[in-house]
Amino acid sequence: MKLPIYLDYSATCPVDPRVAEKMVQYMTMDGTFGNPASRSHRYGWQAEEAVDTAREQIAALLNADPREIVFTSGATESDNLAIKGVAHFYNKQGKHIITSKTEHKAVLDTMRQLEREGFEVTYLDPESNGLIDLAKLEAAMRDDTILVSIMHVNNEIGVVQDIAAIGELCRSRKVVFHVDAAQSAGKVAIDVQEMKVDLISLSAHKAYGPKGIGALYVRRKPRIRLEAQMHGGGHERGFRSGTLPTHQIVGMGEAFRIAKEELQQDYDHALKLRNRLLDGIKDMEAVTINGDLDQRVPHNLNVSFAFVEGESLLMALKDLAVSSGSACTSASLEPSYVLRALGLNDELAHSSIRFSFGRFTTEAEIDYAIELIRVAVDKLRAMSPLWDMYKDGVDLNTVEWAHH
């Protein structure tokens, strides 16, 4: 067993060996290394052909038209292009946007930037299970609302939003609907026709592809217009200039092809591992599972261990590669804004750990993880005076702490 055990698939996945093997064929003199935009010779044509194939593979996972796929450097860029692109193109129709407080930072910080430019953003509170209440979303809509941006699967707690219902609502109100699907592509089925989504952000490295490549799905019927954020040679139908990195695109295409073929298999494997981990820790005292347990992807389990400091637990679990919060914000010691939005207090939010697993995780690794978690939590609680008070029946919420 390789230590530390990797249980942080929500941060990134290892590249599938089949993907890596394919990518290597598009880099050297022996392979297809040409520029897909070179129209005057075979090197360019072959590279363009490889890009077209990848576009088809990515579109197939979404039930989309390959012409609706725009390549970007990743989901962060896709979020920026979608949100700023719509805001700047449709600002004559209105300047109001709706999103939720539990979105990824790539969405929230893009919204903050638009607020500085004079747009008005409504941030919806999720319910305590992490899901968005449709009635609240509808109530927030106004005549000048031009865009709704809601993620499909949350990166910290793994809950799955009812995208089809939100899409139906947005379509009936003629509001553009953007979805960040970085954490759902390859984990749950996505059908852009059924879901009535206008824009979808995708990432390769959350689906066993390489880092540094992503895509934005841009609907053609009804056509969605965007203002480009990256200017240059007019690549990607003018939406996103820059030479296409053939090897990365081929990697993303192959990763999405495998994801489509093995979707059910991957899902069942993750579910088996999730249930095994849950069964191994659910009899522990004062343990909370964060987020809805039914409407969620099985690849993620976010757990709060009361009376244990999250950072200490991470250190005690040095043989497990896990995270508290998401990799994008874990450099800060602030408690997770996602968990705070669910109504968790600071202490509980601070004591949460995200376990995320995937294609290459084994049952033996989960069993070893359970053993380590139980020992570490018991050891840390044994050192905590708060745990003693809790065990003695003291309601810690009623204690008035002296500030000094």
From Swiss-Prot:
Keywords annotated in UniProt: 2Fe-2S, Cytoplasm, Iron, Iron-sulfur, Metal-binding, Pyridoxal phosphate, Transferase
Principal subcellular localisation of the protein: cytoplasm
Family, similarity comment: Belongs to the class-V pyridoxal-phosphate-dependent aminotransferase family. NifS/IscS subfamily.
Residues given in the record as [2Fe-2S] cluster binding sites: C328
Protein name: Cysteine desulfurase IscS
Organism of origin: Vibrio cholerae serotype O1 (strain M66-2)
A Pfam family of this chain: Aminotran_5
GO molecular function, one term: 2 iron, 2 sulfur cluster binding
Subunit-level organization: Homodimer. Forms a heterotetramer with IscU, interacts with other sulfur acceptors.
PANTHER family in alphabetical order: CYSTEINE DESULFURASE, CYSTEINE DESULFURYLASE FAMILY MEMBER
Function: Master enzyme that delivers sulfur to a number of partners involved in Fe-S cluster assembly, tRNA modification or cofactor biosynthesis. Catalyzes the removal of elemental sulfur atoms from cysteine to produce alanine. Functions as a sulfur delivery protein for Fe-S cluster synthesis onto IscU, an Fe-S scaffold assembly protein, as well as other S acceptor proteins.
Highest taxon listed in the record's lineage: Bacteria
Record-annotated active site: C328 (cysteine persulfide intermediate)
GO cellular component, one term: L-cysteine desulfurase complex
Taxonomic lineage of the native organism: Bacteria, Pseudomonadati, Pseudomonadota, Gammaproteobacteria, Vibrionales
Cofactor: pyridoxal 5'-phosphate
Residue positions, PTM N6-(pyridoxal phosphate)lysine: K206
Subcellular location: Cytoplasm
NCBIfam families for the chain: IscS, PRK02948.1, PRK14012.1
Enzyme class: transferase
